[in-house]
Amino acid sequence: MATCKTRVLALSAAGLMLVLGACSKAESAKTPTDLDVTSASAGHYSLVWEHGGSEKVRVFAATDPKNPAAEGKEIGTVDGFSTEVDGLDPLSRWYFEVIDEDGNSTIASTRHVTLQGAANVRDVGGYETADGRSVKWGLVFRGDRLSDLTADDQQTIENAGIRTVVDFRGDSEIAKDGADKVPANVKVVNTAVLDAGTQALATAITSALKSGDPAIVEQVLGGGEAVRISDTGAVDQLSKPDGMAGYSQALRTIADSESAVAYHCTAGKDRTGLMTALLLGILGVPDKTIVDDFVLSNTYNKAKNEQTYTFLSSKGIDVDLLKPLMEQRPSQIQPVLDKIRDQFGGWEKFSQDVLKLDADTIAKLRSKLLTKQ
């Protein structure tokens, strides 16, 4: 196994600090692939790619995802397969491009968008399709409710280029939690997707939990009812025209928008998860990736969920009854993918027959959101 050493390069002109992981040439014989970007603190990023390029790679950073190498700043040259970047504007969204000496490159950013007032906002970009393309970064974002955004959060939203937000919440949810707090130049499109029956069920569950009475919660969610509700919720939506019309409107909004679009519900996991599955499916992203993205909400909602569990436990409520409704599982979204393929005839037919998207809109989505082959 090759050994690695660390060297520090200070770029005073750019106000940046790089920690460059240098490894032997044996580990850098392939083009840079699978660039993974994480951020442990504001303005600081860790970049890791599976293989270094032809001995060395150049690293670029930009706030526009289209072409960081041409439009951004050069961070430095790395002889290896990882680097740390510090000193970037914490309120901007940064995209990184790694280019080897043969000109092969890859672009990526953090999946998660760190905000103080929302926990589950994510970039939908970077996912690979079955035909070898990938979803472009920085054009579509998914999230939880945006009604608690701070001034800094709003600046981050603006800096990310988001100019349209689709809110899947119903009137009662907006009345309870508040309207989205977004910059003045962001258009909010209210598109409720839950039918009256589903909304009534959600209200009944909320009322049971608010009662603080373990017996009432057991009556509503016990006997496997919570699991049944959870596992059938998304797939049942496929047969509800009003809900599908709402998702269709969101897809048209994405296709027609000249800037980035974000969509969200309350927790950013069920309605938003279904919307993301529909979008990624139309784009040709494999089932496994769609499922992985769906359950990723568990990572970002974990802290809030734990607070809820602690509170309910203090009331004597069995939190295991609630977990199927609070946490995402493959069994919630895989039936959606199976039904679209097996009963609706695949994504093309489902998009046209159920979502009522014409061929031009489908083509526009793919042209706008996918890299070229």
Regions found by a protein language model. Name each.
Residues 12-14, 92:
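Non-catalytic accessory regions used for complex assembly or targeting
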Residues 19-22:
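C-terminal motif of bacterial Sec signal peptides marking the signal peptidase cleavage site
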Residues 264:
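Catalytic nucleophile loop of clan PA
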